[in-house]
Amino acid sequence: MKAKHIVVYLLLAIVSSSCIREEALNAEADILSCILPGVAMTTSPIINNNSITIFVGPGTDISELKPEFTLTPGAAISPLSGTERNFNTPQEYTVTAADGVWKKMYTVSVIDTELATNYNFEDTLGGKKYYIFVEREGDKVVMEWASGNAGYAMTGVAKTADDYPTFQITDGKAGKCLSLVTRSTGFFGQIAGMPIAAGNLFIGSFDVNNAMSNPLKATKFGLPFRHVPTYLAGYYKYKAGDQFTEGGKPVNGKRDICDIYAIMYETCESVPTLDGTNAFT
């Protein structure tokens, strides 16, 4: 009888302790937003997983900027938000989660030049699991091209950078070039209802957090442009796929196509950028 009492008491103690256990501290270490007090930004900063790109007008003094950051609840940043730094070169920040364990490194760049207008797709960022194409002025990266590669990484299909839909090859008209292909998304894509992923590259940013829930909204098209466009010219080769599919099923009598286009648009407060849902409206 005593043994039964002991078991009951132990169970009650376990239940009681579980009820009063403190909630675990936040393990997220993200920068959610960024501002430059006293400095006009030409568009909203592009915040990716480990990098932030801030755009200011040409001629802006970027040697003494004091960016301020909004972080996930409880997180801390080093150097402190509002610290004056010289952004003539990219600056590193470390965000530590509220639990004190998880950390994330961010590289923050400030671009004070006009948008590049000549592209050769020779340059990419090194040390990445997939190709990120960039434009440079001297040693400085002035623009990162966006693509859906970050979303494709979630499928787990690609083993090397060349297995992604958007990658670099060596047989361009002169030197290296961009290659876009359609890839299978494997089992992950099948259960998500997105069996294939087309290669793409665009000026803007890709929101990987929306890649699965709303892929069209994940594409944020465009950066500020202050010139009058006259033409779009370049070199390309294209080969249609062997079998056109829709929803994972073959469709006879149809062939896929390649799109290359430039869209110029004016922004407003309610529509700061176009995306895959309204780019052509």
Feature map (PLM): residue ranges:
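Bacterial Sec-dependent N-terminal signal peptides
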Residues: 1-30
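Beta-rich interaction/scaffold domains
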Residues: 19-119
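Short, exposed beta-strand/loop patches in secreted or surface proteins that constitute
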Residues: 40-47, 69, 158-172
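Beta-strand-rich interaction surfaces with strong enrichment in secreted/lumenal proteins
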Residues: 82-83, 219-223, 281
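Extracellular carbohydrate-recognition regions
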Residues: 111-153
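Short carbohydrate-recognition loop motifs
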Residues: 168-188
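Secreted extracellular polysaccharide-interacting domains
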Residues: 181-224
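Short helix-loop boundary/capping segments
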Residues: 231, 235-281
